[in-house]
Amino acid sequence: MTASVSYNRSLSKGRWSFILLWGRNRVLQSGQIANGYLAESTLKFAEHNHVWTRIESADRSSELLLGKQTEPPGFEEQFLARIQAYTAGYDRDFPLIPGLSTALGAQVTFYGKPDILTPIYSQHPVGVILFLRVRPRGNAHSH
């Protein structure tokens, strides 16, 4: 089950968009419910710049503790913890390939997790991405 609300507004030299999303899964065996939430906002400004932020929260089950192992006989999936991710990013459009829209960018994500998940996520989990974005020119999607 999912639900979402989005908003998109043109600006003089850019665009602002926002989405709020919720999703729910139910474990078939136990009927246990797991929820996930996401809020994201992107601002295109000065014609060639994009900045965004995203907040995510997701319920994780005991299956996470198995790693790559298969579920042992009689294993019952149980709620384990809620994990959060906080992301901020930036990219700048520049002409590189004719007919394509290209940008260089970066984003950083910090994670919130309970101590029980430190062996899986580490003490202070952080992710950093540097990227080259390439897409067909004329795409109305602003990020």
What do the predicted segments below correspond to?
Residues 1, 14, 33-37, 82-86, ...:
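Residues that define the transmembrane beta-barrel architecture of outer-membrane proteins
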Residues 2-6, 38-42, 89-91, 129-133:
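Outer-membrane beta-barrel architecture
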Residues 7-16, 48, 95-104, 137-143:
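Short loop/turn motifs that connect adjacent beta-strands in outer-membrane beta-barrel proteins
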Residues 9, 22-28, 55-61, 92-94, ...:
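Transmembrane beta-strands of outer-membrane beta-barrel pores
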Residues 14-20, 39, 49-53, 86, ...:
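Transmembrane beta-strands of outer-membrane beta-barrel proteins
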Residues 21-23, 69-76, 114:
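Extracytoplasmic loops and strand-loop junctions of Gram-negative outer membrane beta-barrel proteins
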Residues 29-36, 63-70, 115-123:
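Outer-membrane beta-barrel translocator domains and adjoining extracellular loop/strand segments
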Residues 88, 122-143:
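Outer-membrane beta-barrel "beta-signal"
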